[in-house]
């Protein structure tokens, strides 16, 4: 999905890269299930009413799984990583909530049906079999794309609701071992309408890109 962002054009209008930010945090993981952490992502789309369309929020997530105590170094661990989002107006679990899954001690635990019924969207859900090192080991490196506010996914999003300042995105982790630390960082790239930005149009790798034929550069 990262390739899509290299040339995001909306109804003949040309969006611009507005801001790129990196968020870093960590979770202390164990089979007891401290599994939920909110990631509040600034969308930067509340500046003026000139925003023609919503921002596209591209998130690149990278996680490092480290041993909390040295005796665990050299062992392997199964780590289930989930990235979820909830609608802006629904009741959301607090940080550290065990309510995302039915049984936090099981890697194959099902997602809470009540949360799904209220609009929970799971953008990433995968189990990784990784060795544990004290100097860290890359667990996950993936990209997901949100069309927001409202966390609409990019490819089929055609409606443009009013702007908001944050999205409710949650990192959920389950492990089959104890005393691990998951340090994660998320890189957020935001696109806005050309009326709010006058710099070069950039792709996801900071290369200047040109508008396709028929698209007005100044629109």
Curated annotation (Swiss-Prot):
Check the record and name the InterPro entries matching this protein.
Answer: BNYVV_p25/p26
- Pfam families, alphabetized: Benyvirus_P25
Which protein is depicted? RNA-3 uncharacterized 24.7 kDa protein
Q: Which organism is it from?
A: Beet necrotic yellow vein mosaic virus (isolate France/F2)
List the lineage, top down. Answer: Viruses, Riboviria, Orthornavirae, Kitrinoviricota, Alsuviricetes
């Amino acid at each position: 999905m990262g390739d899509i962002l290299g040339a995001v054009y909306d109804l003949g209008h040309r969006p611009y890269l507005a801001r790129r930010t990196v968020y870093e945090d960590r979770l202390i993981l164990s089979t007891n299930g401290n599994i939920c952490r909110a990631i509040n992502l600034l969308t930067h789309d509340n500046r003026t009413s000139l925003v023609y369309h919503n921002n596209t929020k591209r998130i690149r997530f990278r996680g490092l799984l480290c041993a909390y105590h040295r005796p665990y170094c050299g062992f392997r661990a199964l780590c289930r990583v989930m990235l979820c989002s909830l609608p802006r107006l629904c009741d959301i679990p607090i940080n550290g909530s065990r309510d995302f899954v039915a049984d936090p001690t099981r890697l194959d635990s099902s997602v809470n049906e009540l949360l799904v019924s209220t609009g929970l969207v799971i953008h990433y859900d995968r189990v990784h079999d990784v060795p544990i090192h004290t100097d860290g080991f890359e667990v996950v490196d993936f990209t997901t794309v949100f069309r927001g506010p409202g966390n609409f996914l990019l490819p089929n999003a055609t409606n443009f609701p009013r702007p908001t300042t944050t999205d409710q995105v949650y990192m959920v982790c389950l492990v089959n071992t104890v005393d691990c630390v998951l340090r994660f960082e998320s890189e957020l790239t935001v696109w806005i309408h050309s009326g709010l930005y006058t710099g070069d149009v950039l792709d996801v790798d900071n290369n200047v890109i040109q508008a396709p034929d028929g698209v007005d550069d100044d629109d």
